[in-house]
Every structure is written in C-alpha cells, then in structure tokens.
C-alpha cells in the first residue's frame, strides 16, 4: 500500500476550446412531413411486441373504416383518419395486411388496440386496404410499382 494521497479529481477546462464546427448554429433543411403534426408513440408498439391478450381483444373487436392520412415506409408508420371522425389513429408497418404499401387517400378497414403502458391512446391493427386511392402509384412490399 502506498501512503501517497489520491490524485485530485479531473476538472473541466476553464477556457473554451473551439474546433469551429460547433460555433455556428446548424439548421437542417427538411421537406414538410405530414407525420409532424401527429405524436408518434414511444417506444413504437409493434405486432411483435404486443401481448397475446391484447391481440385477442383487438381481433374480437369491431371493424372500423378510415382513410390513410399518411404513411412513411422508411419510418415504418403513419396515421389513419377514421371515417366517423375523431383523432387520427397510429398505424405501424407490422399491422398492414396485404401486398400494397398504404399511401395517402387509400380507404382502409382496421381494428383497434390500446397502446401500452397507459392504454390511453389507440393504434390500428389488422389494417386492410379496401380501395386504392385513384391517380396514385402504389408500391408492393417487394418493390414493384403499380399505377392506379
């Protein structure tokens, strides 16, 4: 054992070191996103993480109709506007049935499931596109583009 005192704790520098990269505020140019107005749940609830009991409850529930408000394939989620009004419903990519990627204006049917942990908000599950939006290009999950 040594009788030397422990070294003093490291202190942050008292002067500002500047590299030049952080001196200027950075702004990001972004295209407007229709997803910005909606709140995406965190963590994202997916079919894979849903409990069996929640899946059973949703499957036994009523079928609703709505229109796809927006869907971003790269982000893996979007929103549905219910046909009977009310707030937009969150949609995760894992809950889309069928061969087409939803686009704005597609008519859909869906069931609803509450989003944990508080179960205050709802998400669409078992989503089926019933009518493709006219005048739009639709993509299959495998990447083929079909003009409508």
Swiss-Prot record:
Residues 1-47 are annotated as: Disordered. Signal peptide: none annotated. GO terms for biological process: regulation of mRNA stability. GO terms for molecular function: mRNA 3'-UTR binding. It is found in: Cytoplasm; Cytoplasm, P-body; Cytoplasmic granule. Residues 63-130 form the CSD domain. CDD domains: CSP_CDS. Coiled coil: none annotated. The modification Phosphothreonine is found at residue 46. One of its GO terms (cellular component) is P-body. Keywords: Acetylation, Cytoplasm, Phosphoprotein, RNA-binding. Residues 1-12 have a biased composition (Pro residues). Homodimer. Interacts with STYX. PANTHER family: CALCIUM-REGULATED HEAT STABLE PROTEIN CRHSP-24-RELATED, CALCIUM-REGULATED HEAT-STABLE PROTEIN 1. This is Calcium-regulated heat stable protein 1. It comes from Mus musculus (Mouse).
């Amino acid at each position: 054992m040594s009788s030397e005192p422990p070294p003093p704790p490291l202190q942050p520098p008292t002067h500002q070191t500047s590299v030049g990269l952080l001196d200027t505020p950075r702004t990001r140019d972004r295209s407007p996103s229709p997803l910005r107005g909606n709140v995406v749940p965190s963590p994202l609830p997916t079919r894979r993480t849903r409990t069996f009991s929640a899946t059973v409850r949703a499957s036994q529930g009523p079928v609703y109709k709505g229109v796809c408000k927006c869907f971003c394939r790269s982000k893996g989620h979007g929103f549905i506007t219910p046909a009977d009004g009310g707030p937009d419903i969150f949609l995760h990519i894992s809950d889309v049935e069928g061969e087409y990627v939803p686009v704005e204006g597609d008519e859909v049917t869906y069931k609803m499931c509450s989003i944990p942990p508080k179960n205050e908000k709802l998400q669409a599950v078992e989503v089926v596109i019933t009518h493709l939006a006219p005048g739009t290009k639709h993509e299959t999950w495998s990447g083929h583009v079909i003009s409508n």
